[in-house]
Amino acid sequence: MKFSAYLTTLFIVLFSLFIQTVQAESEVRIVIDEGVDSARPIAIIPFKWNGSDSMPIDVADIISADLRNSGKFNPIAVSKMPQKPTSASEVISDVWSSLGIDAVVVGQVTPNEKGYSIAYQLVDTIGASGNAGEVLSQNQYAVPKNAIRLGAHTISDEVFEKLTAIRGAFRTKIAYVVQKHGGSKPYQVRVADYDGHNQFIVYSSSQPLMSPAWSPDGSKLAYVSFENRKSQLIVHDLQSGARRVIAAFPGHNGAPAFSPDGSKIAFASSKDGVLNIYVMNLGNGTISQLTSGAGNNTEPSWSPDGQSIIFTSDRAGGPQIYQMDVFGNGISLVSAGRGYSGKISADGSILVMIYGDNIVKKDLATGVTEMLSSTFLDESPSISPNGIMIIYSSTQGLGKVLQLVSADGRFKARLPSSDGQIKFPAWSPYLNKN
């Protein structure tokens, strides 16, 4: 198999990026609410362990979970596997194709002094690529001991892209706010892997924190802080821990959103008495006001090309989503009815928003809408960088939890926390070059 030397460097970079953080007390974990029986079946065979003790983490289980979470695949249960090969040469294609499974992933994990060597092969069982039994993709990674999950997510990304022609987003992260039960600093901005693992605290405060937003290179978070008893916008460098106040105007300052090139931040402020959309140039600090007139304007979100901004306004009486260019001109209605918290996917094809109390997807080419959630009081949707998954918060019982739904609505899961309420999720951009 081909050895990817770049990966060891990637693991070091990704972990050093967050070196100044503190490990969180209680991690969130995915709890499946609705499966994907109608999705494409696939087999992720338990990886062979070449060590003397037990394997520290089930790599195949992580890969299965990733592919299942996308809504595109339905991994077969280990108990139903007709064979458990550990290499492509051991895969009996007819056995799998008779079950309707056209792709099988096999692999091995070998411990070494520095960590682990993880190798995998993706096997075509029906000959769609030419011959049954052909290896569609294969690789081998050297990973540090504390990065075995990242190695598994890397395999998931490669398998997903090979089978769908869509870049995988399983090595991305999510930022969110936790309000803990008690303590002197109960409000925390946290970051975790997209699936809730490897959670850590970015910042803790005695006052509320809100609305984290990622910079396009993933190195910074902008968020709202109510320290000093007033709302202010903070840009927080995740590597150095440095915090910069960029807006502390009288009234409310909120809903920060980085431009796609990272040079500007759009935000909402009521500094002149009415909530309006502003854009700040982060290089020189200049501010431009984009909206005006009666009504409140908030929740700015940039289009992928950086040429327009969608936002929520009640100028017509109730909250609706509008779009304007980056100078505040050409304002047009995007959502009919009670819509807010809009986000456009990275490819510009769909708009995800709150419509009524639920998550709704709108195809921007056809105008067709589809309700994706059936949870209660949904808020703050955020789309994965490949447009395949959506994370949001909802009310469950007396608290707030995170919810994950595939963009086709076929897979749904919860990411509850045992130590507080979770709000304001934000999906990171890609954190790796490929």
UniProtKB/Swiss-Prot annotation:
Family: Belongs to the TolB family.
Signal peptide: 1-24
Subcellular localization, as worded in the UniProt entry: Periplasm
Subunit structure of this chain's protein: The Tol-Pal system is composed of five core proteins: the inner membrane proteins TolA, TolQ and TolR, the periplasmic protein TolB and the outer membrane protein Pal. They form a network linking the inner and outer membranes and the peptidoglycan layer.
Gene3D superfamilies referenced in this protein's UniProt entry, alphabetically: TolB, C-terminal domain, TolB, N-terminal domain
Protein name (database record): Tol-Pal system protein TolB
Key word Transcription regulation present: no
Pfam families in UniProt: PD40, TolB_N
Keywords assigned by UniProt, alphabetized: Cell cycle, Cell division, Periplasm, Signal
Taxonomy of the source species: Bacteria, Pseudomonadati, Pseudomonadota, Gammaproteobacteria, Pasteurellales
Species per Swiss-Prot/TrEMBL record: Histophilus somni (strain 129Pt) (Haemophilus somnus)
One GO BP annotation of this record: cell division
Role summary: Part of the Tol-Pal system, which plays a role in outer membrane invagination during cell division and is important for maintaining outer membrane integrity.
Xref: InterPro entries: 6-blade_b-propeller_TolB-like (IPR011042), PD40 (IPR011659), Tol-Pal_TolB (IPR014167), TolB_N (IPR007195)
Chain's gene name: tolB
NCBIfam families associated with the record: propeller_TolB
Membrane spanning stretches: none
A cellular component annotation (GO) from this entry: periplasmic space
